[in-house]
Structure formats: structure tokens, C-alpha cells
Amino acid sequence: MAGRKKAADFEQQLARLQEIVDALEGGDLPLEKSVALYKEGLGLARASREQLAKARNEIRLFTEGEVRDFDPEEGDDGDDR
């Protein structure tokens, strides 16, 4: 359950970050609002990078310390056990 919450939080952060990017790219905001959104976006980007780094480290642990490129076809035999 905790993993689903983290995933939802991550997805919400990305969605909010996209909203901020869209608003800033629109160019219709006052300067103060643009700066505030930019700062919020930086915080969201930093938090998202940290979450991705943590997930990457967890995956490395699952592969017994062996670091290799992700191959979506590798090991997918359709058995989800």
C-alpha cells in the first residue's frame, strides 16, 4: 500500500510540474506569480529526481548489485509470480 501511495505522490508531482510548465510557457502571468511557480517547479523537480534516484537504488538491490541497462523484453515470460 505504501508503494502505491508513493507512486501516486510521484504522479501527482509530475502532473503539477506539467501544469506549472504550461502556465509559464503561456507567458500571460505577472512576474511575481511566474517567479513563485518557478520556485515551486524547482522544488517538485528536485523531489522527483530524489524519488527516481531512490527507486533506481532499490532496483539495483533487487538485481543483487548487478547494474545493467533496463531491457523490457528481458525475463518477461508472462509469469507474474
Swiss-Prot record:
Coiled coil ranges: none
Pfam families: Exonuc_VII_S
Enzyme Commission code: 3.1.11.6
GO molecular function, one term: exodeoxyribonuclease VII activity
Compartments where found: Cytoplasm
Gene3D superfamilies, per the entry: Exonuclease VII, small subunit (1.10.287.1040)
Predominant location category: cytoplasm
Disulfide bonds: none
Database matches in InterPro entries: Exonuc_VII_S, Exonuc_VII_ssu_sf
GO biological process, alphabetically ordered: DNA catabolic process
Keyword terms: Cytoplasm, Exonuclease, Hydrolase, Nuclease
GO cellular component, one term: exodeoxyribonuclease VII complex
Signal peptide: none
The keyword Glycosyltransferase appears for this protein: no
Catalytic activity field: Exonucleolytic cleavage in either 5'- to 3'- or 3'- to 5'-direction to yield nucleoside 5'-phosphates
Function: Bidirectionally degrades single-stranded DNA into large acid-insoluble oligonucleotides, which are then degraded further into small acid-soluble oligonucleotides.
Matches recorded under HAMAP family: Exonuc_7_S (MF_00337)
Similarity-based family: Belongs to the XseB family.
Subunit (UniProt): Heterooligomer composed of large and small subunits.
Name under which the protein is recorded: Exodeoxyribonuclease 7 small subunit
Species this protein is from: Nitratidesulfovibrio vulgaris (strain ATCC 29579 / DSM 644 / CCUG 34227 / NCIMB 8303 / VKM B-1760 / Hildenborough)
Gene from which this protein is expressed: xseB
